[in-house]
């Protein structure tokens, strides 16, 4: 890629220039932090002075940097569209109670934080909000409302907060200045989009290698949209000095508000800048940009346009009475209270289903436990089996993704199969490069740093002497031709300048292609499938190279630096001990102790056409990438005889006839592709039987999902979902994770008889095999956090698709391979499109409720795990998620997390209507406050 050569030739980055100048000019402060620290997740800048104090002994640059860092906390990172991560758009406010966070979001971004009255009314009338639960919740929060009057109050806009306090309508008072704001935005956006382009532009912005601040100066002087370019021609060398110079005209008491307003004016673009600085990609190394440089450009533009910064101290967004700030008193908006009742209604149903299933299995499980002991002293009882005394036909491990719940249920119904749930990166934090990929990807959650580099290479290098070599040659010829065509089309289609006249300039040939995709998408799918089938499967021609020798890399990975990551110093491959640890961790977290003849790790990916948000449908645990590579790596590890030997020393005895395979579940079509090249002849019948049953499961799952997509049960389900996958005009190829509402952590037997409607994340866990609680802690700090991100993204994209989502797909345009905007310009959109959450304009599909988590374990064990997990308890205490424990040591009784590591027994209410709660860590009953 272009970034490689640019990165090597670049002599001085913007960050280096800014840091050196700061050290020269800011001698009064000992901190040498770079501007990258102003984004969330970076090290904070320590200060000893109050920045709001006008004491001039405190360096202006120091104060500016503090304010930038503080403002950046409210703008979460925005991942590029090619690897879009569904994250919480209000992640910067998770240290606040939910109702205060949405009020802050309304003030800063103008976004609605709660469903509107029509949504609540529909949920109430359809039973999604139970009337009795709503009544109890309204009483609990001390309102004067009945259920009917509460819904009516929202509809009329006369809501009151809890505690019988009414709010005061707030406004920003800056409506007259909205044009000034737009004048700055449209100029800075023009140069941001040019600078941050990730390979789609035919002509690059000049001087990008010098950094955004310098590049902006070089072009702004020729920008006819800027009336007074003299103010930009000779600015300070360091952008921090430029910011301080502009701010010097204002009292220091106003600096914080001015900086926050400028940083949050375009949260999409600033979120992308934060992503770049936090992840230090090759694009960032080659073309550096910081929030300080961006802020300097904005402020210089305001100066050149003669726009006073104190007149645009906040975006022109009004804040409704339902989202007012409650900073001084602990009150709850009525929407919050009704939302809680909605969530409790769902949670009650989920807990009842799980508890009933747990009770039904209890005696069966006890019987199986005794039966297992008679099989042999070396056989452990298996918690996740329907019948542990019968060896399963196969065991399949899926991602915890809600879409896996549907296919798992249908697979289990076709035979003696066991399915498990595990994070879709299968516990291996790697940077992965496929056999024919030009760049590598981080195949791990965004909250986890990659630890290893793994690349694929050809199984047989001598293509003239081996069948696999012939496969490689044919594969590469076809793939090169295909990729060349795709690159040309993508370059034209994704460039704003060329997109609108693309079809005209490419002539009738492309028009025929568009017509075929529009009129005959099923035929197109069939043709593409036949072409794909002529190519050898990737597992036939290549395999992941796990050896630590750096020489074993593919033809594309001869450089340490690739097009996606800079100066990559990650070690190649995995040591033997690392392989053992990753395999053992997977089995221990899932509670998998006994094995069938075939054990499969099934990643997942999507298949869509003309979909900028396609990566949002891929595996979130793989950072918006396909999960197949992660599955292949873990399967290869587990088939290693040396690894199996070491696992036996740890009490994990894998039978000699157990074979591990990998696969990939295409969630759009529910097709599961198995990678079976390494399967011995002795297991071919097992594989054929499994593949036949997977085809049956696909048909059943497709029929179930199609009903929710179209409601038409008369069409062929397989044909229709294949059409959706190939139809370039299809705005809703699948629902993705829409509908997600719950997360169950426990053995499959809790839910195997329950239709969870594809709304629940399922992570396998056996508390009896987790003596130290470390497995539970790993699940709570990893998968739970990721699912909360996903849930929050869907929630906010549903309640305000214009601010927290991305509006309609029909009017979206891609920008420089980094994002999308509505129409022909503006801020980068930060969330999912309306088609991902709504059936129609007036008909929601996704129910906007927060995540209800259920853990099957002793409440004391969960309390112990939470005690040191501040990041998790913060989400719980601030009502971003809820937690219920089903305690198997107490006859599967349920306990709801209250606050401060305290619990209330199910049936005794949740908070205010209960007089006592238990504190398991001290094994006694203690008095609890009402909150």
From Swiss-Prot:
It is a peripheral membrane protein. It is found in: Cell membrane. Zn(2+) binds at residues 399, 401, 604, 619. The keyword Membrane applies. Its cofactor is Zn(2+). Keywords: Cell membrane, Membrane, Metal-binding, Transport, Zinc. Residues 7-25, 360-376 have a biased composition (Basic and acidic residues). Residues 1-57, 360-390 are annotated as: Disordered. GO terms for cellular component: plasma membrane. Its main location: membrane. The keyword Electron transport does not apply. GO terms for molecular function: zinc ion binding. InterPro entries: DabA. Part of an energy-coupled inorganic carbon pump. Forms a complex with DabB. Belongs to the inorganic carbon transporter (TC 9.A.2) DabA family. PANTHER family: INORGANIC CARBON TRANSPORTER SUBUNIT DABA-RELATED, UPF0753 PROTEIN AQ_863. This is Probable inorganic carbon transporter subunit DabA. It comes from Haloquadratum walsbyi (strain DSM 16790 / HBSQ001). The lineage of its organism: Archaea, Methanobacteriati, Methanobacteriota, Stenosarchaea group, Halobacteria.
